Amino acid sequence: MKDEVVVVTGLAAMEPLIVHRMIVERTAAGTMIIETWTTAHTHESMAVRRASMSMTTHLKSKVQRIPTRPPRAPRLSVGGGGGTGTVPLARQASPETATIGTRTIGPSKGRRRRRRMRRRRRRRPVTSSC
């Protein structure tokens, strides 16, 4: 059985992020590394770095097999696009805010209020002063 093992090193702030990928073959006799290759992404974006960090959980010396599985839907829908979260659609409010039961996750109330005010202000015609 062949596995692809991905080891990510260089997760400190400005270290280049290096991904070592190894094809590991598991037989009855034991495990054997068939080939390794390295892809170096210098100064990868923090998002990628954070993702890989949570993926490998401080991989410095350990080798951990990261199963290649399709990304699951995010737990909460992130603004726009409507019900992308795992919330049943019946309970979902506007696409802007994902509602779980009664708890709303989304833009803060302040921002919403501000937007409402702006909308109200725009509608009134400007009276010319002359």
UniProtKB/Swiss-Prot annotation:
Predominant location: nucleus
For this record, the Gene Ontology CC terms, alphabetical, are:
nucleolus
Q: Where in the cell is it found?
A: Nucleus, Nucleolus
Q: According to the UniProt record, which cysteines are disulfide-bonded? A: none
Specify whether Nucleotidyltransferase is a keyword of the entry. no
Q: Which GO terms describe its biological process?
A: 3'-UTR-mediated mRNA stabilization; negative regulation of cell population proliferation; negative regulation of mRNA splicing, via spliceosome; negative regulation of ribosomal large subunit export from nucleus; negative regulation of transcription by RNA polymerase II; negative regulation of vascular associated smooth muscle cell proliferation; positive regulation of vascular associated smooth muscle cell apoptotic process; regulation of vascular associated smooth muscle cell apoptotic process
Residue ranges for the region (Disordered) are 61-130
Compositional bias ranges of the Basic residues kind = 109-130
Record bears the keyword Metal-binding: no
UniProt entry keywords in alphabetical sequence:
Nucleus
Q: Remarks, anything else?
A: MINAS-60 is the product of an alternative open reading frame (alt-ORF) of transcripts coding for the RBM10 (AC Q99KG3) protein. MINAS-60 and RBM10 ORFs are overlapping and are formed by shifting the reading frame.
Its biological purpose is as follows: Acts as a late-stage inhibitor of pre-60S ribosome assembly by preventing pre-60S ribosome export from nucleus.
Subunit arrangement? Answer: Interacts with 60S ribosome assembly factors GTPBP4 and MRTO4.
Q: What is this protein called?
A: Ribosome biogenesis inhibitor MINAS-60
The species this protein belongs to is: Mus musculus (Mouse)
Query: What is the primary gene name for this protein?
Result: Rbm10
